[in-house]
C-alpha cells in the first residue's frame, strides 16, 4: 500500500469522496505556494496536486499556462519546487502528487528524477504527455520508491485502452472529464457518468475526475456520478491570483462542504 492508496481506502471506508486541489508551484512566488499548501491541508484537502511550472504545458488551459509563465518569470525551477516540498512536507498530512511533463524527467533520467522527488516527499506523479506504451518502466521505477504513477483516461479512450490503463494504473485513475486542455467549464459532460461505469466494470481502483470542474455544484455532480475523487485546478489557481491564500482556503472549505453533503433522496 502507498500513501495515496491508503488515503482512498480510508475515504472509501467512510463513504466519502476525495477533494484534490491543484496549484502551480511558484505562482506568484514560492512562499505563497507554501502558505497555500498549508491552507489546503488545513481546510480538508485529501490529496494535493502540485504543478511544476513548464514552458510548453500542452495539457494546460490558459489559466494554468499563465500561472506557469508567472512562476517561471519569478525564477521557479524544478529544484526550487522540490526544495519547497521537502521543507513543508512534514507539516502536511495530505499525499502530494506532482504534475509535470516528460522533458524534465528525460533530462534527468528516470531514476535520478524519481530519487529526487521521493527524497522531497512526493507520493504520486502525473505526466500528461507520457504515452501509455512508454509508461510501464517509469511506473515500475516509481513504485520501487513508493511513488504512484497516475495514468489518465480521456473521454475519447477506446474500451481496449481503458482496460489497459486500468490494469496498469497505480494510486488512482485520473479520468479527464472533457476533451482538450484544462480549464473551467460551465457544464460537465454526462459522458463522464457513462465512463465511470465503464471503468468500474473492469477495476475497483479509485477514480478521480478532473479538467473543467469549477465550483461546488459541479464537484457535487461528479461525486454523485460515483467518482472517488474530484480534482479542481483552474478554479484554485484563479482564486489564488484574485484573492490570495485566504481565497484558496475559502474555496477549499466550500468544495469540502459540497462533496461531503449527503445527496437528497427523492
UniProtKB/Swiss-Prot annotation:
The keyword Flavoprotein does not apply. The keyword DNA-binding does not apply. CDD domains: Tryptophan_synthase_alpha. GO terms for cellular component: cytosol. The active site is at residues 49, 60. It catalyses: (1S,2R)-1-C-(indol-3-yl)glycerol 3-phosphate + L-serine = D-glyceraldehyde 3-phosphate + L-tryptophan + H2O. It comes from the Bacteria. Its EC number is 4.2.1.20. Keywords: Amino-acid biosynthesis, Aromatic amino acid biosynthesis, Lyase, Tryptophan biosynthesis. GO terms for molecular function: tryptophan synthase activity. It is an enzyme of class 4 (lyase). Pathway: Amino-acid biosynthesis; L-tryptophan biosynthesis; L-tryptophan from chorismate: step 5/5. HAMAP family: Trp_synth_alpha. PANTHER family: TRYPTOPHAN SYNTHASE ALPHA CHAIN, CHLOROPLASTIC, TRYPTOPHAN SYNTHASE, ALPHA CHAIN. The alpha subunit is responsible for the aldol cleavage of indoleglycerol phosphate to indole and glyceraldehyde 3-phosphate. Tetramer of two alpha and two beta chains. Belongs to the TrpA family. This is Tryptophan synthase alpha chain. The gene is trpA.
